[in-house]
């Protein structure tokens, strides 16, 4: 099964090492992909050269393995339509400035058939009303791994 961590999971790992115990369980059971939107957000959040090198080190293995998923034109349209439909129902995401980026990550997950693991289940759950994306919280996902 394909797996994507959204930006929030990568940030939590960089700050608190949350993937330290999860990654050994993921290997061999999932095909982990890096979303190029998440990669761009991580790079944009870097304030120092050291941080940029750290993020480059995170991205490089995915590039070498050919496991970076980048939005296509169809993904942009699918993401924009989902946001438009969401707005038409009166719903909004908690961070409207990042709404398109989140919707693009969801569209990427749909295209590659990946489970999207996030700390932002509320917003991705809203997107799932208009995009057939499978979403799990990081906590639920890691508990599932521990029980397997």
List the model feature ranges, each with a label.
Residues 1, 29-32, 65-67, 110-115:
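Short active-site oxyanion
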Residues 1-34, 38, 44-60, 142-147:
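Short, well-structured N-terminal submotif of metal-dependent ribonuclease cores
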Residues 66-93:
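Acidic catalytic patch
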Residues 9-10, 38, 75, 105, ...:
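Alpha-helix capping/helix-boundary segments
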Residues 39, 52-55, 76-83, 102:
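A general structural signal for well-ordered alpha-helical segments in protein cores
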Residues 106-148:
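Acidic, PIN/NYN-like endoribonuclease modules and their adjacent C-terminal/linker elements
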């Amino acid at each position: 099964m394909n797996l994507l961590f959204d930006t929030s999971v990568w940030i939590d790992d960089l700050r608190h090492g949350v993937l330290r115990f999860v990654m050994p369980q993921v290997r061999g059971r999932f095909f982990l992909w890096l979303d190029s939107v998440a990669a761009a957000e991580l790079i944009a959040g870097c304030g120092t050269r050291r941080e940029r090198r750290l993020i480059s080190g995170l991205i490089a293995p995915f590039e070498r393995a050919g496991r970076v998923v980048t939005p296509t034109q169809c993904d942009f349209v699918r993401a924009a339509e989902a946001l438009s439909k969401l707005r038409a129902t009166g719903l909004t995401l908690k961070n409207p400035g990042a709404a398109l980026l989140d919707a693009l990550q969801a569209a990427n997950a749909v295209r590659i058939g990946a489970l999207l693991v996030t700390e932002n289940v509320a917003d991705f759950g809203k997107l799932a009303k208009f995009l057939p994306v499978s979403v799990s919280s990081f906590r639920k996902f890691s508990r599932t791994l521990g029980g397997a």
